[in-house]
């Protein structure tokens, strides 16, 4: 434990909070050609490379990723979620924060259905099971076995 005199000479430093997605906290002034402190929830970018990579040790797969040059001139690696995608080089994409735990260096996700990225094809929403025997063509949800 430090003495009062030691704390007077050298005060305690507060912890610096590190961002999980630092590229989203930087803007770019193209007129002055300088980076600015302008945070954003998403950023637009151009895919410079689209490919697959293998995950860390216990998992095994081919995860799809894209290398993206953002509008603030920072280049990041972003994960392409969902089954199948239509991204190519020079596709304009929207990225959001959020890492992929088993892919080292991937701290961003591409937003499906925004800009050049198509949504996931043939994706079905889960049907809530209410415990009733309802026929498929019975659209109003009236019970079948009522008399």
UniProtKB/Swiss-Prot annotation:
What gene name is given for the protein in this entry?
rpsL
Top-level taxonomic group: Bacteria
Q: In which family does this protein belong, per the annotation? A: Belongs to the universal ribosomal protein uS12 family.
- Signal sequence annotation: none
Which Gene Ontology MF annotations are present? rRNA binding; structural constituent of ribosome; tRNA binding
The protein's name in its UniProt record: Small ribosomal subunit protein uS12
> What role does this protein play?
With S4 and S5 plays an important role in translational accuracy.
Q: HAMAP family under this entry?
A: Ribosomal_uS12_B (MF_00403_B)
């Amino acid at each position: 434990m430090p003495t009062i005199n030691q704390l007077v000479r050298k005060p305690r430093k507060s912890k610096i909070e590190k961002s999980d997605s630092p590229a989203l906290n930087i803007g770019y002034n193209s007129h002055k050609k300088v980076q600015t402190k302008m945070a954003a929830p998403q950023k637009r970018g151009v895919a410079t490379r689209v490919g697959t990579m293998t995950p860390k040790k216990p998992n095994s797969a081919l995860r799809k990723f894209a290398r993206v040059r953002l509008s603030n001139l920072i280049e990041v690696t972003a994960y392409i979620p969902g089954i199948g995608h239509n991204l190519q080089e020079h596709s304009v994409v929207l990225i959001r924060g959020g890492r992929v735990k088993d892919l080292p260096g991937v701290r961003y996700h591409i937003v499906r259905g925004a800009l050049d990225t198509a949504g996931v094809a043939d994706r079905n929403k889960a049907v809530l099971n209410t415990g009733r025997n309802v026929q498929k063509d019975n659209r109003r949800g009236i019970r079948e076995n009522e008399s």
